Each structure stands twice: as structure tokens, then as C-alpha cells.
């Protein structure tokens, strides 16, 4: 698939109903989490069943991981067969290159952000990652690298130029995503907890509302 330069990613999907809501709302990316500490964690075999109805229908599927080992990469590619793998840990540029080569698909590299110096880290992944993602730095002691509802100063991304399409993530919801897009100038947005009624419980109505808000912001 070609590199998407605009749109929204709904992350942490786990039911047929929420996958349908994301697809019907024209989400560009559907994210499935493979991290056992997350309330959104699903087995690769479950994700494979969830993506089957939308496979090849113009949406990119994303396997979201944290410092994945080769065994997990192999299992994901043998079952879910995602279009992209997202890495949300302490992966180095060389490790991201290894993952991309092993999987044979592009990689989204996520960065935890609280200052402009954190945004600067992206330069080291030039030519390595297919997409970049800037997420809020989790509070100290959190076991989750993302999906916490925390947000950072969107203005840190304003006017920045990157060699790859980039996502804004962290604390987005149907009510603030329009402002976030306007302030940051970011072409891609990612949401997880902002479309939930409880930890890991995605709400189809909130997914639809979020995607509608993204469309309005880009009109």
C-alpha cells in the first residue's frame, strides 16, 4: 500500500462492532494492540478474525507493539498479516530497520513527548520508519506507553517538517481533535481512550463522532 498522508487511526480495537464503526467512518488506519499490560490487548488470532471483513478494502491495519521480539513479529505476520507494525517502546533505529525487514511491512515509530527535544528524536529515524507518531509522555510509574488520555503541547509540532507522514496522539477526543489539528498542523491523528466509555471499551458512537470531527477539521 502507498504511504497515507492524511486521516485518522482508531487504536485498540477489539470487537467487530468497533471495527465496523471505524471502517464505516472512513478511518485510514485500524490499530490492534499486542501488549499484555494494556486493557486493549488482543491475541493475534483474534485480530486476524477482526480484520478479515475489511482486508483489502482501502484501510490499513496496524499491529501496535512495545519492544516486540522476533517471535511476536513472526506470529503477527503469520496470523493477522498487518499492513504496518507500530512500535511504542525504546526501539533504536537499527531495531526498527530489523523489524521492517523481518516483517516485510512498514513501521510506525512512536515517541513519548513532553518537550521539543523529544520531537527532535525523530531525525534519527529518517529513512527507517515509514510513519512517525508523537504521543504524550506517560506519567512516571505508568506501565502503558500510550492510551492513557494524557496530552502534550500540540504547538510543539507546529511548523515542524518531517521526511515521513506523522501522527499526533495523546488525549485526543471528538471535542478537541479539531483544535489539535489546527494547532499542530499534523496531517494524521490517533485516538484510543478518547473514544472509550471505560478502559479498553471502545464506543462505536464515539468513534463515529471522532471521525466526523476529523473530517470537519480538514474541510
UniProtKB/Swiss-Prot annotation:
Per the record, the pathway is: Amino-acid biosynthesis; L-tryptophan biosynthesis; L-tryptophan from chorismate: step 3/5
Asked if DNA damage is a keyword of the record, the answer is no
Any idea of its EC number? 5.3.1.24
Q: Does the record carry NAD as a key word? A: no
Q: What reaction does this enzyme carry out catalytically?
A: N-(5-phospho-beta-D-ribosyl)anthranilate = 1-(2-carboxyphenylamino)-1-deoxy-D-ribulose 5-phosphate
Q: Which UniProt keywords apply?
A: Amino-acid biosynthesis, Aromatic amino acid biosynthesis, Isomerase, Tryptophan biosynthesis
A Gene Ontology molecular-function term? Answer: phosphoribosylanthranilate isomerase activity
Q: Which GO terms describe its biological process?
A: L-tryptophan biosynthetic process
Task: Extract the CDD domains matched here.
Answer: PRAI
Task: Supply the NCBIfam families for this chain.
Answer: PRK01222.1-1 (NF002295)
HAMAP family, from UniProt?
PRAI
Q: What is this protein called?
A: N-(5'-phosphoribosyl)anthranilate isomerase
Q: Which organism is it from?
A: Caulobacter vibrioides (strain ATCC 19089 / CIP 103742 / CB 15) (Caulobacter crescentus)
Q: Which gene encodes it?
A: trpF
